[in-house]
Every structure is written in C-alpha cells, then in structure tokens.
Amino acid sequence: MASHRTDRTKNPTSNGDVSKVDLLLHPELLSQEFIQLMLQERNIAVSDPEDRDRLTGLYLQHVIPLPQRELPRSRWGKRMEKSRPRLSSSSTHSSSTDSGRKRPLIVFDGSSTSTGCVKLKKPDSSSAPVTTDRLKPPVSSVSLTNPIRKLSGASTNCSSSNFSNRTPVSSSGAIPKSPSNHSNSSVHSNNATSKLKRTSPSKGEPDTAKDIKSPETKKKIQHITWP
C-alpha cells in the first residue's frame, strides 16, 4: 500500500518521461516522420518533406490548437462553456458565406499609405430641377406698384374712427369754402363721440343711484355726538 501511495504522489515527468500531450505541443521533440503523418491526416500538402524547419512551421500553423483561457468554475464559466460550440459553428458559417461571395473583402495591408486628394463634385445649379412647392411666391412675381397689405382688426377700427373725425377735404389744390363749416363738423363729431361715451354707462347709472338712496347706506352713516 505504501509503495502504491508513493507511486501516486510521484510526478509523471520527474523521471524524464514526457506525456503525449507535451510531445504534441512541442514539435521539435517529434520525429520528422510523425510530423509528416500528422500533416497528411490534415490534408496539408508538403512541398519539401526533407526540410525540418518547413515541417515544423506547418505543424505549428495547422496542427497545434490555439490557446484558450481557462474559464472559472462559476455560473458565468458554465454559461460560456455552453456558448463556445455555438460561437465555433457561427464562425464556420461566416467563413463559408465569405467564401461564397462574388467579390472578395477589401483588406488594408498598409502598403499604400499615400492617398490622393479627394475631389468633390459640385452640384450644377443649371441642371437642378425647379421646385414648385413654395410657401411664398418669389420676389420677382410680386408687383411693387400695387402691394397688398393686410391690416389687423384693431388697426382698421382706428383708421375708421380717424376717418370719421377728419373733415371732408376736396381734391388736391382746393380751398375749403368757409371756416364755419369746419367748426360745425368738428362740433358735430365731438357731440357724437360724447353721446357714445354717455350711452355705455347709462345702464349702470340707476343701480348706483339706488345704492345711494337705499336705507342701508343711511343706517351705516352715523353722526358723532359729543357729550
């Protein structure tokens, strides 16, 4: 039992015995015939089988797996382990679609670093179509001799009142007949405006008179008597 325990505790590589995995990861320790056999299994053509360095480079390029980070034994690590085969299948699918493309992908190799000046084509104003959807008419179509002006309601009322207050004037160059007509018209207009002003508060006047004559107001007014 003791000897069996000591055999278990011994390191397998302590006696110089190298495992098969370590041999596969170190092609310099493998024989030339074994490397050729591995390349033939991967269907990789070898131009010069006698060149040791060439065989080693092909082995490192096609046979040795890519290094991968070990995932932790947690929930996230288990989830990533399940998603790894999906990623590999998607990568193979994308590679097959890339190979089936008509035009190859453009890859910048860094050789052509000097780029020419970029020329921008200016749009031709003459060939551009004339748009008919305009919110306002162009300036050229507006007649400057007879412009149309829109006035608000307040301005029209003011203009009408001013026009009523003004005296009637004859054509240019004519002289009014007499100053008495001018004074009579101004007095008439003033009387008309005063009547308009008086008619508006006429409705509220009887109410105010009633309020003054009501007995409640008389009761509130008390005369102060001195002893």
Swiss-Prot record:
Q: In which broad location class does this protein mainly occur, judging by the first location in its UniProt entry?
A: nucleus
Give the span(s) annotated as Disordered. Answer: 71-227
Keyword Nucleus on this protein?
Answer: yes
Q: Does the keyword Isomerase apply?
A: no
GO terms under cellular component = nucleus; tRNA-splicing ligase complex
Regions of compositional bias (Basic and acidic residues) in chain numbering = 71-84, 204-219
Compositional bias segments (type: Low complexity): 88-98, 178-191
Q: Which superkingdom?
A: Eukaryota
Q: Name one Pfam family in it.
A: Ashwin
> Which keywords belong to this entry?
Nucleus
Q: Where in the cell is it found?
A: Nucleus
Q: Polar residues composition bias: which ranges?
A: 153-173
What are the GO BP annotations of this UniProt entry? embryonic morphogenesis
Protein family membership: Belongs to the ashwin family.
UniProt-recorded name of the protein: Ashwin
